[in-house]
Every structure is written in structure tokens, then in C-alpha cells.
């Protein structure tokens, strides 16, 4: 195996024995093989488009799901990748039968082995290092593109589940993956393709924003309890709002309280979700703390989308996966039929007594923020608000992430902190007060709600008649996995400069690629909170 797609990759270089995330070598090889098979499907789709042959939308949906399944902390069950690999080949063959062009040797001629051991052996020779390329910088950009495409695939899949999709997004997934096996592009062409990845991710996030707000309403500022009520309980982690909605419907009147964990916290702001009286509050913090937090939870646990870690024996019997999530030995529930989860919750003790642990606020997505835009603009003009910080991104276990806690704590009282994604859990419960009734800490949502932050920035730039880079706004970002890569590429596509990124820089970027980002976008690693605040504010 070789994998270096996440921020915590071993020694900052790459995992080659077992994933820091817990991914076993066989699963890593199967994921690589799936990506290889998908590249062959992508080559067929690109050839079909060139001949005017329509690629079914269903193929795009499958492609997004399959790529998403290889994202960090999604699926650790080797058996789940076998049908995905075979389906990629079947769909490729179906397209190939409709076109005149002879597809190239390689991914488009791949024949899967007949058993699991054979597939693992094939995956061994079709990994990241086996993609044809002799130029280290172009290889770096190819890998960056693959990881960005995984991020797009995650958002496209979520949006499609709620009925929002754009064939152009799927077409880019094909275009990008097919390109990774070409050798005729120079460095400039690869930079352009990577930036196009950011452009398409913006569209994918727009679709997901439309999907979530169309189904559940625009988020509104909402107070969320951090404590619990006495009684039976189910904890929902991940990102999938549809799964949560179905669970809320199926548990209504059953005496079970529903709690969010991790990136599900912003769900409390959606009107069509918060209306359920048994949707009580938020439990725990970010994904990397689940071993301790899940072990102490006295009810059933449902994992939607990514962020699962190896379950401890103490709760393996009470954790359930759904959608693309998989862990060997954990019960997987399909098609929103959460009866087994509910039965388990009813059989478990639940919380013995009420406990008040304070509250936090969420729901400050673009509609909520723009509804008070006039007040915000007036406060800036009056000197009451000096600066905005977007302190956002992924959380993780690697040392150095306390930087973000300290940065927010030390941000001056005349500044506003916008946040989103699970990086917020480094400071989400800090009491920062307000400026003229505007809370100084505004939780804008999940990682995909970077779309909200971008829309707010663009609107503020319009109000002040300046560019986004001229706003009193600084982005201090943390990253962990591939959705964060896609979001970073979106910001670069938009020309956003002076981004601070941490806790460490991606291992897949060569020094020359990093130098390009510094020279053209002034992207920089975080240093210390004091030094960075001084550099930003003077």
C-alpha cells in the first residue's frame, strides 16, 4: 500500500504498512484498484462524449459514490469494494460497446480478477505510484486532482441523494480522472485542470446547498443543548441530513431522544429538522474523539458518510453504518430502514438523568448572515468590527491543532470569527460575546457550507465595492481529508489569496508546486497565533 491523501499521513510522507486512519493494506489496495477501474470508465465516458454518445446520469451517480467510498474514513470493509470494482468494469464495457473509438490499453482494458485475493494482488500494482508520469511536479498535480475529485464526488453524491445534480459535474469527474493517464500536458495545463477542479467543486457545493435548503429550509440561528435528557438515545454522526430526517421520522413517539455528533451539529439549524421535539441536542466533539465519546454513550450510534474509526469492542455491538460507510463486524443498515438502530436504542439503558452542560449556537449560514448584512456593514464602517476571521476546516488528532483554539481565544474583541466544518470543535463552546448584538462566533455549518462563506464574502465585497482579497477578512484553515482539498482548490480558483493553512502542508505537494502557490496566491503555513494575528492586524 501507499497512501498520503490525508493530513495525518505517516511521518508526513505516506502510509505504506497500515493507514494512520486504520486502513489495512488490503483495503488500501482495493481502493487503489477501484480508482484504477474508475479511470477506465472515465476514459470510456470521455470517448463517448467525443462521439456524441450520451453517458447515462446513473453512471455519473455511481462514479461519484464509488470515488467517495475511497475517501478517508469512509469504508474499511474489503468486501464492499468487490462489487464496486466489477460495476466499474461493467459500465465501462457497456459504454465501449456504443462507441467506435478503440480505448487505450491500461485502465480501459482492465479485467478484474475472479476472487478477492486476486483483486488485492491487482491493486498492489495499480496504486498512486503506478500512474504514468516522470515529472515529479506533474505527478504531484495529478495526485492533487485525484484527491480534489474525491472531494467533489462526496458533495455530488450528497446532492444527488436529495435530487440535485448537474451532468457537467459528472463530466468533469470523467475528464479529470481520464487525464491522469495522459502524458501530453505540460505543467501549465495541469495547473489549469487542478483549478478547474476547484471551479467544479464550487458547483457541487452549490448543488448541495440547494439540496439541503430545498429539503429542510434555510438554517436559522439556533441554541443547541450540549447536555442530555433522561431516556433512551441515538447518536448520529457523519454528514447526511436525509438519514437524520428519516431517523427522526421513524423514532417519533417512541421515547427516544436523538443527538448529533461531529459535523451533524449544524443540522439543528434546519427548520424541517429542528421541528422534531425529540431532536434534543449535541453530544461530544469531533471525529477523532469518538473512541472515548462513543464508549460513554448509553444508546445506539449511527454513522452516516465518513468519519468512522475502528470501533472499540465496548460499543461495536451498538454502532451501525449506513450509506457508503463500512466497518467489518458493524451492522450495516440500508435504504433508510433504521429499525435495527431503534431496537438497539430501546434495549440499551439510555441516560439515567437530565444533565445540563450548557449550550452553543449554530445556524449562521448565508441567509442568516445576509439578513443582518446592513448591521454588519454599518458596524464595519463605524469601526466597531475591525476584522473577520474564517477559522474553518477539519479537525484531527495530530499535535498542533490547539493553534486554532488559541487563535480564536486571542482574536481581539472587535473581530468576528466565522467557522464551519469540524475544526470548530477546537473552540465551538467558547463564550466570545457579541458586537452590537452580532455574536462574535458564527457557526456557518458543515464543511460543504464553505459555499455559504464564499457567498457571504462575495456579497460583502460587493457592498464595499472591492474584491474579496481587499476585505478585512482572513482565512485560517485546517485540513485533514479530500473534501478540504477540493475546497482549497475552489478558493484558489476564485483567486483568494493570503490563506493560512495547517497544521501541516499536504505531503503530496512538491516544493515546486508549493512555491507556485506561494508566489501566485501567497498561501502560507500557520506559525503561532500571536505571530499570525500580528501579521494580519498589524
UniProtKB/Swiss-Prot annotation:
Catalyzes the reduction of hydroxylamine to form NH(3) and H(2)O. It is an enzyme of class 1 (oxidoreductase). It is found in: Cytoplasm. One of its GO terms (biological process) is response to hydrogen peroxide. One of its GO terms (molecular function) is peroxidase activity. This is Hydroxylamine reductase. Keywords: 4Fe-4S, Cytoplasm, Iron, Iron-sulfur, Metal-binding, Oxidoreductase. It comes from Solidesulfovibrio magneticus (strain ATCC 700980 / DSM 13731 / RS-1) (Desulfovibrio magneticus). Its cofactor is [4Fe-4S] cluster; hybrid [4Fe-2O-2S] cluster. HAMAP family: Hydroxylam_reduct (MF_00069). The modification Cysteine persulfide is found at residue 394. CDD domains: HCP. [4Fe-4S] cluster binds at residues 3, 6, 15, 21. InterPro entries: HCP/CODH (IPR004137), Hydroxylam_reduct (IPR010048), Prismane-like_a/b-sand (IPR016099), Prismane-like_sf (IPR011254), Prismane_a-bundle (IPR016100). It holds the Pfam family Prismane. GO terms for cellular component: cytoplasm. It catalyses: A + NH4(+) + H2O = hydroxylamine + AH2 + H(+). It comes from the Bacteria. Binds 1 [4Fe-4S] cluster. Hybrid [4Fe-2O-2S] cluster binds at residues 239, 263, 307, 394, 422, 447, 481, 483. Its EC number is 1.7.99.1. Belongs to the HCP family.
Amino acid at each position: 500500500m501507499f497512501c498520503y491523501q490525508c493530513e495525518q499521513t505517516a511521518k508526513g510522507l505516506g502510509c505504506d504498512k497500515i493507514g494512520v486512519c486504520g486502513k489495512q493494506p488490503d483495503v488500501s489496495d482495493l481502493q487503489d484498484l477501484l480508482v484504477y477501474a474508475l479511470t477506465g470508465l472515465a476514459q470510456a465516458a470521455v470517448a463517448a462524449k467525443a462521439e456524441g454518445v450520451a453517458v447515462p446520469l446513473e453512471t455519473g451517480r455511481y462514479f461519484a459514490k464509488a470515488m467517495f467510498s475511497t475517501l478517508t474514513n469512509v469504508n474499511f470493509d474489503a468486501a464492499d469494494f468487490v462489487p464496486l470494482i466489477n460495476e466499474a468494469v461493467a459500465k465501462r464495457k457497456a459504454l465501449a460497446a456504443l462507441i467506435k473509438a478503440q480505448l487505450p490499453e491500461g485502465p480501459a482494458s482492465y479485467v478484474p480478477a475472479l476472487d478477492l485475493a486476486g483483486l488485492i494482488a491487482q491493486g498492489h500494482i495499480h496504486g498512486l505510484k503506478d500512474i504514468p508520469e516522470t515529472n515529479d511536479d506533474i505527478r504531484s498535480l495529478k495526485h492533487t486532482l485525484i484527491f480534489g475529485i474525491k472531494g467533489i464526488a462526496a458533495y455530488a453524491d450528497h446532492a444527488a441523494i436529495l435530487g440535485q445534480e448537474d451532468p457537467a459535474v459528472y463530466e468533469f469527474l470523467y475528464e479529470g480522472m481520464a487525464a491522469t493517464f495522459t502524458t501530453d500536458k505540460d505543467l501549465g495545463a495541469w495547473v489549469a485542470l487542478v483549478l478547474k477542479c476547484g471551479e467544479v467543486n464550487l458547483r457541487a457545493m452549490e448543488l448541495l446547498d440547494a439540496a439541503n435548503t430545498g429539503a429542510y429550509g434555510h438554517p436559522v440561528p439556533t441554541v443547541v443543548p450540549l447536555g442530555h435528557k433522561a431516556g433512551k438515545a441515538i447518536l448520529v454522526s457523519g454528514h447526511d441530513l436525509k438519514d437524520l430526517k428519516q431517523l427522526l421520522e421513524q423514532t417519533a413517539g417512541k421515547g427516544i431522544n436523538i443527538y448529533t455528533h461531529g459535523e451533524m451539529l449544524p443540522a439543528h439549524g434546519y427548520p424541517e429538522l429542528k421541528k422534531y421535539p425529540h431532536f434534543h441536542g449535541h453530544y461530544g466533539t469531533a471525529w477523532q474523539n469518538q473512541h472515548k465519546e462513543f464508549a460513554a454513550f448509553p444508546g445506539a450510534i449511527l454513522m452516516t458518510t465518513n468519519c468512522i474509526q475502528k470501533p472499540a469492542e465496548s460499543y461495536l455491538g451498538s454502532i451501525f453504518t449506513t450509506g457508503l460507510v463500512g466497518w467489518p463486524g458493524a451492522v450495516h443498515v440500508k435504504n433508510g430502514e433504521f429499525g435495527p438502530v431503534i431496537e438497539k436504542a430501546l434495549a440499551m439503558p439510555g441516560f439515567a438523568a437530565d444533565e445540563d452542560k450548557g449550550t452553543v449556537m449554530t445556524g449562521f449560514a448565508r441567509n442568516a448572515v445576509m439578513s443582518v448584512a446592513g448591521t454588519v456593514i454599518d458596524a464595519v464602517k463605524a469601526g466597531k468590527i475591525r476584522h473577520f476571521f474564517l477559522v474553518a476546516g477539519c479537525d484531527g488528532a495530530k499535535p498542533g491543532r490547539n493553534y486554532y483554539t488559541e487563535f480564536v481565544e486571542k482574536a481581539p474583541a472587535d473581530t468576528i470569527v466565522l467557522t464551519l466544518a469540524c475544526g470548530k470543535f477546537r473552540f465551538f463552546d467558547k463564550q466570545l460575546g457579541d458586537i452590537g448584538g452580532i455574536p462574535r462566533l458564527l457557526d456557518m455549518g458543515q464543511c460543504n457550507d464553505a459555499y455559504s462563506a464564499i457567498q457571504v464574502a462575495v456579497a460583502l465585497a460587493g457592498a464595499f465595492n472591492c474584491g474579496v482579497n481587499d476585505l478585512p477578512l482572513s482565512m485560517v484553515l485546517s485540513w485533514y481529508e479530500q473534501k478540504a482539498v477540493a475546497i482549497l482548490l475552489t478558493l484558489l480558483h476564485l483567486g483568494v489569496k493570503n490563506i493560512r493553512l495547517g497544521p501541516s502542508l499536504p505531503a503530496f505537494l512538491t516544493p515546486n508546486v508549493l512555491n507556485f502557490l506561494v508566489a501566485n496566491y501567497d498561501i502560507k503555513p500557520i506559525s503561532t497565533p500571536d505571530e499570525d494575528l500580528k501579521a494580519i492586524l498589524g
